[in-house]
Amino acid sequence: MSGGRGQVVGGRPAGCPRSFCGCGASIRVFGHIVPGLNLAANWLRFPRTSPAPGMVAARRGHVFVLEQHVEGDIWMAYDANSGGRSTRIHARSLRGYTVVNPRAA
């Protein structure tokens, strides 16, 4: 579930593939492209954790970065390739996603 269109903050970052949610998330989290994380499913290799700012919601096919808790399972998210080839900050449900800690290895 997406809570409205949110705020568009960009498009496909330079150097990212056509399907760029994983690439955009790696730039947001690590400050640069991590090629192995371009595939959304690869984020599921990180340890599971509880939702918190800076953690990542992942499933096969999509990934986004948690920014701020709204209520219940709704979080403001940095969501690259969130539709129309745009990157948005908008409210997203965590339903159907696994929350992982990309800084734990």
PLM region descriptions:
Residues 1-69:
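Secreted/periplasmic proteins that engage bacterial cell-wall peptidoglycan
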Residues 5-11, 69-105:
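Aromatic- and glycine-rich peptidoglycan recognition patches
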